[in-house]
Amino acid sequence: MFKKGDILIRNFSMGDFLIFKEYDGEDELVSYWDMAFDRPVVEQNIRSWYVDSVHLATEWELEWFFEDLKREGLRWNAKTKQVEKIPTM
């Protein structure tokens, strides 16, 4: 079972990440945010992820995820469950 804020990655993907929000029925889930390797745009509240199609990100995958966010000028705030722009000086 996934917990709110868990960072997941789609099985057999090249870097399709999502941040778990809640279950939607028995076999689907809703995410706070979604980011795919082929579109660096981060989208909010994507539906229709099948539970069987994702897994909890490994340490290596987490590093990859956070680096991708950083490259886009973003960061994950685990406390507020928001993707935020990194402030510039």
What name fits each language-model region?
Residues 8:
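Short, surface-exposed loop/strand segments
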Residues 11-49:
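Basic/aromatic-rich interaction segments and small domains that mediate binding to polyanionic partners
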Residues 36-89:
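Intrinsically disordered, low-complexity, charged/polar segments
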